[in-house]
């Protein structure tokens, strides 16, 4: 999938999606049936007979995504697929990407020059300088422990509370007296910080089964959110 979409202007949505299948020698009707499944997957029902010029930029990119998935690749490669979109449509497509990844569970290589986009979409991020990888790690570890000064420049202004999950900053369970408040380890810090900061004691961090897997003191939230930010004063 590329930022310019690369759709064939004389073919409809359905024909564009079916095209790579037909190139592989799949029978026309089978390719059309598969293409229609992809149309539904990316939410373009009712637009399968439209031409690219009749679609918005976001819709065109959905066609590109559907076409790339129709051939069932082992590795899904996306080269700056959303960079040509305006901010609102770009966010919509990022959310759509996450939905598809959750549904399909594919290995994805996603190239972007937008660090915030990488943090939102990536399970592991490789930051490169002059063709050499400076750091390859999870988003949380890159934000909390940048390996080089070059990487640190990327992370200085990152709003940590919007990126990090509770599990990224929690402590191991201990025998301390805890607050009555419990928070999920999968919560983004921003979503629960206000509740945690009203507590005097550490809160319990729980997993999907309601089991306590860690603790978190309110002071850790303050340190995490403000401790690593660049001082502009």
Language model: regions and residue ranges:
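Catalytic Walker B motif of ABC-type/P-loop ATPase nucleotide-binding domains
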Residues: 76-79
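Conserved ABC ATPase "signature" C-loop
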Residues: 130-131
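Short coil-to-helix segment of the ABC ATPase nucleotide-binding domain corresponding to the Q-loop/switch region
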Residues: 11-18
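ABC ATPase "signature
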Residues: 136-137, 145, 215
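Conserved ABC ATPase signature
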Residues: 51-55, 59
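A short, proline-enriched helix->beta-strand linker immediately N-terminal to the Walker B motif
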Residues: 70-74
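Conserved ABC ATPase "signature" region
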Residues: 18, 22, 29-47
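The conserved cystathionine-beta-synthase
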Residues: 178-209, 216-233
């Amino acid at each position: 999938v590329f930022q310019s979409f690369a759709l064939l202007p004389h073919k409809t949505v359905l024909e564009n999606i079916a095209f790579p299948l037909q190139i592989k020698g799949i029978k026309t009707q089978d390719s059309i049936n598969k293409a229609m499944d992809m149309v539904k997957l990316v939410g373009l029902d009712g637009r399968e007979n439209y031409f690219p010029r009749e679609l918005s930029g976001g819709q065109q990119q959905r066609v590109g995504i559907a076409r790339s998935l129709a051939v069932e690749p082992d590795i899904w490669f996306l080269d700056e697929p959303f960079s040509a979109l305006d901010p609102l449509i770009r966010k919509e497509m990022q959310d759509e990407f996450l939905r598809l990844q959750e549904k399909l569970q594919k290995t994805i290589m996603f190239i972007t020059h937008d660090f915030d986009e990488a943090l939102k979409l990536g399970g592991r991020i490789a930051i490169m300088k002059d063709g050499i990888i400076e750091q390859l790690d999870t988003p949380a570890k890159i934000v909390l422990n940048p390996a080089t000064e070059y990487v640190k420049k990327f992370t200085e202004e990152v709003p940590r509370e919007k990126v990090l999950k509770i599990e990224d900053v929690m402590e191991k369970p201990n025998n301390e007296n805890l607050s009555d408040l419990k928070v999920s380890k999968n919560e983004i810090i921003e979503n629960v910080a206000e509740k945690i900061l009203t507590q005097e004691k550490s809160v319990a961090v729980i997993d999907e089964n309601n089991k306590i897997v860690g603790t978190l003191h309110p002071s850790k939230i303050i340190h995490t959110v403000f401790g690593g930010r660049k001082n502009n004063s």
